[in-house]
Amino acid sequence: LSEKNEFIEKSKREMNVSGFGFGSMGGFYTLAEVLSELDNMKVLFPNLITTKVSIGNTVESRPMYMVKISDNPEIDELEPEVLYTALHHAREPQSMMQMIYFMYYLLENYSTDPAIQYLVNNRELFFIPVVNPDGYEYNRITNPTGGGMWRKNRKNNGGSFGVDLNRNYGPYAYWNSPNGGSSTSPSSDTYRGTAPFSEPETINIKNFLATRNFKNALNYHTYSNLLVYPYGALSNETPDSLIFREYAMDMTEFNNYTYGTDMQTVGYSTRGNSDDYFYDGDTVLN
């Protein structure tokens, strides 16, 4: 408790963030608490953030919520759009917590920080803090004080449960890459599903992307201190790898994260992941 209080006071003092706190699930926000935080942001900063909007329902019929932060959040302005997602994997709540903190940082410092003013005034920032609400709620039910290790969604596979949402993206050539970067066994933590976009959660993301014109996207995970960019499914680098490296050098200057492709960072290949699809798996981010 003393460490939590110390963090909160340091955050107020050094980062001017007072809205962020700790949740009831081992310090992490529960799903209900995440939604409450989004509502609270709207009450406190009605001119900078939208009301939460569902982009579709999950396999267990839970809504997947999105909000937008911008200087005119209710208007679609001709500004570059950026997408942030978290909790593809239900056992990575720190990804969501970091996102909520970042959102409060933007909102609470907007009136005093010129850099944040520029960002919010000249970009449209979209946030999906819980891509996998079913899996996350399952962890709360089975481990209410925290520590739940369920990773996948809660698809009933007929004897086992769950599809790894970050192995369920298309296109087929990426999803079915011969690199072995996912499993065909329904009981595996990296089970890819029966086909690309077999799950409502990934379909919801795909459909949402098709309605926007995103110029960049960051998908938050919590495995190690890494900044990972495409490709995961292919052995070659992208045509934009030099640009990715330049961005990555700037983004890791202070945290010293390792950056690169899947093989260059985590040391293994993946297939059907969100980064590859967002990059060139469809026309949405091209």
Language-model-derived ranges and their functions:
Residues 1-22:
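Extreme N-terminal flexible tails
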Residues 26-82, 152:
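Soluble metallo-hydrolase cores and metallopeptidase-like ectodomains found primarily
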Residues 34-37, 94-102, 119, 123, ...:
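Stable alpha-helical elements in mature extracytoplasmic
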Residues 39, 43, 103-112, 132, ...:
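Sec-exported extracytoplasmic/periplasmic mature domains
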Residues 51-56, 63-68, 81-85, 92-95, ...:
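Structural recognition of the beta-strand scaffold that forms the well-ordered cores
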Residues 75-108:
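Enzymes and membrane/adaptor proteins characterized by extended Gly/Ser/Thr/Asp/Glu-rich
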Residues 95-139:
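Short helix-loop-beta-strand segments that form the rim/entrance of peptidase-like active sites
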Residues 145-286:
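Metallocarboxypeptidase
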